[in-house]
Amino acid sequence: MKRLYSFLAGILAIILVLWGISYHLDSKINSRDSQKLVIYNWGDYIDPELLEKFTEETGIQVQYETFDSNEAMYTKIKQGGTTYDVAIPSEYMINKMKDEDLLVPLDYSKIEGIENIGPEFLNQSFDPNNQYSIPYFWGTLGIVYNETMVEEAPEHWDDLWKPEYKNSIMLFDGAREVLGLGLNSLGYSLNSKDPQQLEETVDKLYELTPNIKAIVADEMKGYMIQNNAAIGVTFSGEASQMLEKNPNLKYVVPTEASNLWFDNMVIPKTVKNQDAAYAFINFMLKPENALKNAEYVGYSTPNNAAKEMLPEETKEDKSFYPDADTMKHLEVYEKFDHKWTGIYSDLFLQFKMYRK
């Protein structure tokens, strides 16, 4: 019997030792995870020095992963199996993710610095009261042009139809963007669901065909930077990168109407470290950090405290910081259901096929 007790005691001792090792390893892993932040963002969309600064200030290591489209980001988070703590989707995707319960409602008792964000960038239709997102960058859809290749600068959407721009215009390859500029040129909302307005818009876009050089996406940068196209319809962030590399380029936002876009910080349901997520959001809300990020990326900051620290020529540039009157005429893309997404896509596809 003593041998049995000794044997059982030995087994128990081994179990306790193994449990202790397992507990120690789990504690180390949990401790390491609690000191790690996983960010899911667009490529080259943050100053790398800010990530280093965040780690220095908080002790939290950053794992930075990138995506190249909102759809790719959505799919990966929707499928699960990821541990992203913070993501940076665009406004229409925030709406979609919110409706599909993929985002964590924000706890504003843990957020510091929201007062630095301009009120004009808050409480947008895609996220009322900013229940799920905090503005990161914003911008517009407009016209970039080469002043050495046009006699008169295009300032309005209607200008694109001028005969002197034959085979000169690069359009962004997007249904909402192209149909939107057509709708705006006729005085309609870029979110129109009026069949008559859409028919009128498509007819007018067909008339633009002789002026279109190509319908492209990222390739537009190369064309414009290398003086291979006179005019492009693109987003302000893309335009700022083009202007930086070609002094002949200018960017203008048609004052009659255009698109206002946002990329916002959210906490996905995949979050593993909420404390680190809030720490990062608060870090990016600090004016000095938002300023550094805006100067590196070249996009417009929604942080008004940071904007005040920008060079005068930058913050007074109405192309990237439009005045209040222009802002009144800008619209975000409203989320379309499957039916209307299909209608816009079909109309755009028909337009592209026609011009060939």
Task: For each feature predicted by the language model, list its residue ranges.
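Conserved C-terminal helix/tail region of periplasmic/extracytoplasmic solute-binding proteins
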Residues: 324-356
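Ligand-binding "clamshell"
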Residues: 98-105, 127-131, 242-253, 315-318
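A ligand-binding cleft/hinge motif common to bilobed small-molecule-binding domains
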Residues: 93-96, 225-226, 231-248
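Extracytoplasmic ligand-binding site segments that recognize negatively charged/polar headgroups
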Residues: 83, 88-211, 215-228
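A bilobed periplasmic-binding-protein/Venus flytrap-type ligand-binding module shared by bacterial periplasmic
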Residues: 142-149, 183-187, 261-273, 281-284, ...
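Early extracytoplasmic/lumenal segment of secretory-pathway proteins
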Residues: 7, 20-96, 109
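Periplasmic-binding protein-like
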Residues: 198-207, 245-269
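Mature extracytoplasmic/periplasmic domains
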Residues: 268-328
